[in-house]
Amino acid sequence: VTGGARASAYGRVATELALYGDLRLRELVDGGEPIGRGIGGRTVRLEVGGTPVFVKQVRLTDLERRAENVHSTANVFGLPAFCQYGYGTPAFGAWRELAVHVMTTNWVLAGDHEGFPLMYHWRVLPGPRQPLPEELADVDGAVAAWGGGSGVRRRIEGLRDSSASLTLFLEHVPQNLHDWLRVQVAAGGDATARALAMVEEELEAGTSFMNARGLLHFDAHFENILTDGRRLFFADFGLALSSRFELGQDEREFFALHRAYDRCYTVTHLVNWLVAELFGHAADQRRAYVRALAEGEGRGGCATGRRGHPRPARADRRSDGRLLACVP
């Protein structure tokens, strides 16, 4: 879809949704096709005027709904900065996620970079309390896992007791990178080579663009990146951190130390993903195998993978160790 077509669809859908009252919008979302439910929220697919729309419902806690905190990008729960990392984090708040979608949508509409899904509309909608996701369901265990602090407990219990959602209406891109790339790699030959070249180029372009503008994604695995087969779209900003947020001193220091995190993370993820997909190594074997390749070992016997696929492009061009600075 061209930039002009995306902007045109944005105008139509954004206007249509803005005209809906809360009750009608709630009914529209409730009638959508369920896609999933996870730690980041419930997702559905629906159509607005014939245009497919992806809807994400992010829990909005009572603390975030207080007048003094509405739209605040501050760390209102006082979470430790290391909650930016990893699987199962309670995340820092819905308003931060919204702010990033506003940023990225404006970048797309201004023609600065196309690699983000547009946000057509957002609304705070009431709804019944929902069970916590599996990763946080054991509140005491989750609190302990994230350092045991009182802020972590307030955050998780706030999510548990939430009776409203920040509902995001986003451009629908039907494929995530994980699923799409598996098909391309299975095809082998030129299809694999073209796909890997596009992915490598787009990962670098997208992370460089975000990071140069003070935005760190922090969760850019391949199920959080979408594709139309021609470019990548970075999505799911539940852990994103911007230098333009209202940051405390600890977060400013954390941000400064992690400016290269996205680039290292995406390179690491691509390499490990390819080795696992092509050769099927377990995690410990995979790390040893990647290091051996980067150090120039195994080239003769590993020209093709176990299914006859070529070894990941450019692996031996990075044997000087630059890649390994990002690969655990």
Where are these regions (language model features)?
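Conserved hydrophobic alpha-helix
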Residues: 206-210
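C-lobe/activation-segment region of protein kinase-like
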Residues: 233-327
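Regulatory N- and C-terminal appendages and interdomain linkers associated
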Residues: 1-53, 60-68, 278, 296-328
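Catalytic-loop of the protein kinase fold
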Residues: 212-222, 227
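Activation segment of protein kinase catalytic domains, centered on the conserved DFG
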Residues: 185-199
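Conserved ATP-binding subdomain of kinase catalytic cores across diverse folds
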Residues: 28-167
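Activation segment
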Residues: 60, 125, 175, 228-243
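Conserved short submotifs of the Hanks-type protein kinase catalytic core
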Residues: 165-176
